[in-house]
């Protein structure tokens, strides 16, 4: 059962992975503290940055990532129309080619989810 306003188990497991990746990368650079974790999230990734931050605040306690902030950049949904070849950015409200109206689209970006960079103390 999920409390109102709480994150989902989806974000919990994602946050665990983010923390593991970040701690490993920071250790390789001999970092003493992680100040920020920068993410690239596709508009259709399904990841809610506020939920990731909430879980990170709990999971990172006692690690060099304690107090780290999540900074997320959203990658727009880019598609190529199979009917006319137009490449464009679309959103959830208008899932059709803006040039010809076709819904036969090939996704080029928009589901990304990656740790892009860290801000650390060394």
Placement of each model-derived feature along the sequence:
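Extended interfacial segments that mediate partner engagement and assembly in macromolecular machines
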Residues: 2-4, 8-23, 46-49, 65-71, ...
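A broadly conserved sequence feature marking short terminus-proximal activation segments
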Residues: 18-21, 25-77, 83-86
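Short functional micro-motifs and their immediate structural scaffolds
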Residues: 89, 105-106
